[in-house]
Design a protein with these regions (language model features):
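C-terminal "cap" of GNAT-fold acetyltransferases
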Residues: 149-158, 177-191
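Conserved GNAT acetyl-CoA-binding A-motif
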Residues: 111-114, 142-156
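Conserved acetyl-CoA-binding loop-helix of GNAT-fold acetyltransferases
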Residues: 121, 127-140, 166
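Conserved active-site alpha-helix within GNAT-family acetyltransferase domains
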Residues: 132, 144-147, 157-174, 181
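Helix-loop element at the rim of GNAT/NAT acetyltransferase active sites that forms part
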Residues: 1-26
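A short helix-loop-beta-strand connector motif used in the catalytic cores of GNAT acetyltransferases and
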Residues: 30-48, 115
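Conserved acyl-donor/pantetheine-binding loop and adjacent beta-alpha core of acyl/acetyltransferases
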Residues: 58-119
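Conserved beta-hairpin
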Residues: 41-61
Length: 191
């Protein structure tokens, strides 16, 4: 899935050009692997679309929390996965990622919601409805969850803002991580 993020402005800034730089590619792969591991440890939703054995697109969504107990248990298990990541990514990269998380989470709505951590489609599958199908599934999941009042997400691509607005999202906050613009958006169900 790392190729799905090769032109992402945040990934380009934090990791470098993963299409041209093998070290950047290794860092992106390590980070995405960590995100998937974290998602399984915290019982987040990981959903994808396949063509036979080939993953075309996937998303990772944090669900609204009703209990802190699974997070505590997952947190202890996550530490064992975080330690190797510290040796795979530079200190600067870890600081930038931490800043990104802090800034974007502070822009999230105060009500219980699903948080779209990431959504990506392989370049050769883009424009074929894979992303739209994944978003439709996320909307169905959110509508079926009585705990959730909507969805929050962040994008660094200005052209994605209009795309998400067509799906019913509103721009909650616009900020920057150094020179990288970040658009924090929300979808509130039953408006």
């Amino acid at each position: 899935m790392s190729r799905a993020f090769s032109r992402d402005p945040l990934f380009m800034y934090v990791f470098g050009d993963s299409e041209l730089d093998s070290e950047a590619r290794k860092s992106v792969t390590a980070f995405l692997s960590f995100l998937f591991d974290k998602s399984f440890l915290f019982h987040e939703e990981v959903w994808g679309i396949f063509d036979e054995d080939s993953l075309l697109g996937t998303y990772v969504v944090e669900k609204p929390q009703t209990s802190k107990l699974p997070n505590i248990k997952g947190g202890f298990l996550l530490i064992s996965r975080l330690i190797p990541l510290v040796f795979q990514l530079s200190g600067k990269t870890l600081i930038l990622l931490n800043s990104y998380m802090r800034i974007t989470r502070s822009a999230a709505p105060p009500w219980k919601h699903h948080y779209l951590i990431m959504i990506g489609v392989k370049p050769e599958a883009q424009g074929k409805g894979v992303g739209k199908t994944m978003m439709q599934h996320l909307f169905q999941t959110t509508q079926a969850d009585p705990e959730s009042q909507g969805i929050a997400l962040d994008t660094e691509k200005e052209e994605n803002v209009a795309l998400y607005q067509k799906l019913g999202f509103t721009l909650r906050e616009q900020t920057k991580i150094d020179n990288v613009p970040v658009y924090c958006m929300v979808y509130q169900k039953n408006r």
